[in-house]
């Protein structure tokens, strides 16, 4: 969530409202958060007054005892009665403070990160600006077939639906080997850039998941395993929590991770979209870039991360556009986000393979991942967290299959042939 101090200061509070309006919200949550925070401060001030008075009364009672008085004496009995009344008031106040804090936390989680000035203000993804492009020089197959047709003998979607339900699948044979080759190549690619390979938990406790996900994701995206456990939708969630409740000094950052995990998504908002094939499924594998850095370096690493993605897809010789995501399409945690959209020749469309976000200190504040050893202006400083898909394996596989189809089958990209152990997947008629 954002820094509550931004809401307390009238000047910065207006900036938060402006940022919310860029997300095409009314900004009323900012005013509500301000009122709840002020109410909390007032109640805590009253609690401090009560505690101070109780401590004073206890000292006076002890002094009276030392003078030989007992609690039935008039002045002491009045003091004892006052302590009881104050204690009852304090108990009620503490309950009220807890209720206000819970409501404040809920409201604050609904306020998005401060949007970067460079983000285009729009609520229509058609306005996403193209930042950079790459075009393959390979000769494409005429009348290309869609990936779902090309892969049908390897995905066993009917059997998958029987055992798992909608969007279930098995992946077999050389297509599964190609997926494995793509995974190994993506890991090696990032390790060669100084990233530390890490396999993450695929389940997180509810209290941890709440700190790494939007509230709307709990219903729309996340699978619940037990009352207190959820399956991750991306390894970003488990990587973000790796240093939860810790302090990192400048010498420890940046930390750059290549995360590998299975991912699970309900895709509740995608009913009717991409029903065929592996492009949009409930269970998939993903190789993720994740960077932890100091506040002054996150913009630099954000650019480095998207350029690493570009190098990866250039090495696969896949045509793509990098687009900047408009303000109204940003998730709450992101201050700025790039998508890499790759070309699918059968539809003659560019479709998202990569999302790369700078979340600044939005997630680290809730996770209490602090930065440095001193407070700035008596305020805590937090690390910045960045995430970016390197390879969503099933989606990237669909893209490669379409782009590398030939009259004989599926040609294997040069950089994958050593991992795959060949240069062609033969297809039946």
Curated annotation (Swiss-Prot):
Sequence positions that bind ATP: 265-267, 281, 352-355
Q: Which cysteines are joined by disulfide bonds?
A: none
What pathway does the UniProt record associate with this protein? Answer: Aminoacyl-tRNA biosynthesis; selenocysteinyl-tRNA(Sec) biosynthesis; L-seryl-tRNA(Sec) from L-serine and tRNA(Sec): step 1/1
Chain sites annotated for binding L-serine: 234-236, 288, 389
Task: List the Gene Ontology MF annotations in alphabetical order.
Answer: ATP binding; serine-tRNA ligase activity
Q: Which GO terms describe its biological process?
A: seryl-tRNA aminoacylation
The reply on keyword Ligase is: yes
Alphabetical keyword list:
Aminoacyl-tRNA synthetase, ATP-binding, Ligase, Nucleotide-binding, Protein biosynthesis
Catalysed reactions, semicolon-separated: tRNA(Ser) + L-serine + ATP = L-seryl-tRNA(Ser) + AMP + diphosphate + H(+); tRNA(Sec) + L-serine + ATP = L-seryl-tRNA(Sec) + AMP + diphosphate + H(+)
Under the heading PROSITE patterns, the entry gives: AA_TRNA_LIGASE_II (PS50862)
Q: What is its EC number?
A: 6.1.1.11
The entry describes its oligomerization and partners as: Homodimer. The tRNA molecule probably binds across the dimer.
Domain note for this entry? Consists of two distinct domains, a catalytic core and a N-terminal extension that is involved in tRNA binding.
Job of this protein: Catalyzes the attachment of serine to tRNA(Ser). Is also probably able to aminoacylate tRNA(Sec) with serine, to form the misacylated tRNA L-seryl-tRNA(Sec), which will be further converted into selenocysteinyl-tRNA(Sec).
Q: What is this protein called?
A: Serine--tRNA ligase
């Amino acid at each position: 969530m954002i820094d509550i101090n931004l809401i307390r200061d009238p000047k910065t509070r207006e900036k938060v409202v402006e940022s919310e309006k860029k997300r095409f919200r009314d900004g009323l949550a900012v005013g509500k958060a301000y009122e709840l925070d002020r109410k909390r401060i007032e109640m805590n001030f009253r609690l401090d007054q009560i505690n101070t008075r109780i401590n004073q009364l206890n000292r006076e009672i002890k002094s009276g005892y030392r003078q030989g008085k007992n609690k039935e004496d008039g002045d002491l009995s009045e003091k004892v009665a006052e302590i009881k009344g104050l204690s009852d008031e304090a108990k009620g106040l503490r309950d009220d403070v807890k209720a206000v804090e819970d409501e404040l936390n809920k409201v604050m989680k609904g306020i998005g990160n401060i949007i970067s000035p460079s983000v285009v203000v729009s609520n229509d993804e058609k306005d996403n600006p193209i930042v950079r492009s790459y075009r393959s020089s390979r000769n494409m197959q005429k009348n290309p077939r869609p990936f779902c047709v090309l892969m049908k003998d390897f995905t066993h979607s009917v059997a998958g639906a029987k055992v798992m339900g909608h969007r279930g699948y098995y992946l077999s044979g050389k297509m599964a080997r190609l997926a494995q080759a793509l995974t190994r190549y993506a890991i090696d690619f990032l390790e060669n850039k100084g990233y530390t390979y890490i396999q993450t938990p695929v389940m997180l406790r509810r209290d941890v998941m709440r700190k790494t996900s939007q509230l709307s994701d709990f219903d729309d995206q996340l699978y619940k395993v037990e009352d207190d456990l959820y399956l991750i939708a991306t390894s970003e969630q488990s990587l973000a929590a790796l240093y939860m409740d810790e302090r990192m000094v400048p010498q420890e950052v940046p930390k750059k991770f290549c995360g590998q995990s299975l991912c699970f998504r309900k895709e509740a908002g995608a009913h009717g979209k991409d029903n065929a094939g592996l492009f949009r499924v409930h269970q998939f594998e993903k190789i993720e870039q994740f960077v932890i850095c100091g506040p002054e370096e996150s913009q630099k690493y954000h650019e480095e991360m998207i350029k690493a993605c570009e190098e990866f897809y250039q090495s696969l010789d896949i045509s793509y556009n990098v687009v900047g995501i408009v303000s109204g399409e940003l998730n709450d945690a992101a201050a700025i986000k790039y998508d890499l959209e790759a070309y699918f020749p059968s539809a003659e469309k560019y479709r998202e393979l990569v999302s790369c976000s700078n979340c600044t200190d939005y997630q680290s504040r809730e996770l209490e991942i602090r930065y440095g050893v001193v407070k700035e202006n008596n305020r805590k400083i937090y690390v910045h967290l960045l995430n970016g898909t390197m390879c969503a394996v099933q989606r990237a596989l669909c893209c490669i299959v379409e782009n590398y189809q030939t009259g004989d089958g599926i040609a294997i990209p040069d950089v994958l042939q050593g991992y795959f152990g060949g240069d062609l997947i033969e297809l039946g008629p």
